[in-house]
């Protein structure tokens, strides 16, 4: 049970992190050289 829970948490964090990086990279690509944080 613990191993399944830990694996689920790890996969969740990895998916969220990868999604966040993809979104930020996409927004930077759309904006170009503009840095509007």
From Swiss-Prot:
Protease among keywords: no
GO molecular function, a single term: electron transporter, transferring electrons within cytochrome b6/f complex of photosystem II activity
Gene Ontology cellular component terms for the protein in this record: chloroplast thylakoid membrane; cytochrome b6f complex
Keywords tagged on the record: Chloroplast, Electron transport, Membrane, Photosynthesis, Plastid, Thylakoid, Transmembrane, Transmembrane helix, Transport
Principal location class: plastid
Pfam families cross-referenced by the UniProt entry: PetG
Gene Ontology BP, a term: photosynthesis
Signal peptide: none
SUPFAM superfamilies found in the cross-reference section: PetG subunit of the cytochrome b6f complex
Membrane topology: Single-pass membrane protein
Subcellular location: Plastid, Chloroplast thylakoid membrane
Transmembrane segments: 5-25
Subunit structure: The 4 large subunits of the cytochrome b6-f complex are cytochrome b6, subunit IV (17 kDa polypeptide, PetD), cytochrome f and the Rieske protein, while the 4 small subunits are PetG, PetL, PetM and PetN. The complex functions as a dimer.
Family statement: Belongs to the PetG family.
Function: Component of the cytochrome b6-f complex, which mediates electron transfer between photosystem II (PSII) and photosystem I (PSI), cyclic electron flow around PSI, and state transitions. PetG is required for either the stability or assembly of the cytochrome b6-f complex.
Name the record gives this protein: Cytochrome b6-f complex subunit 5
Source organism of the structure: Psilotum nudum (Whisk fern)
Gene symbol of the encoding locus: petG
């Amino acid at each position: 049970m613990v191993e399944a829970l830990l694996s689920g948490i790890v996969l969740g964090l990895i998916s969220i992190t990868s999604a966040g990086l993809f979104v930020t990279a996409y927004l930077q690509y759309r904006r170009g050289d503009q840095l509007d944080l």
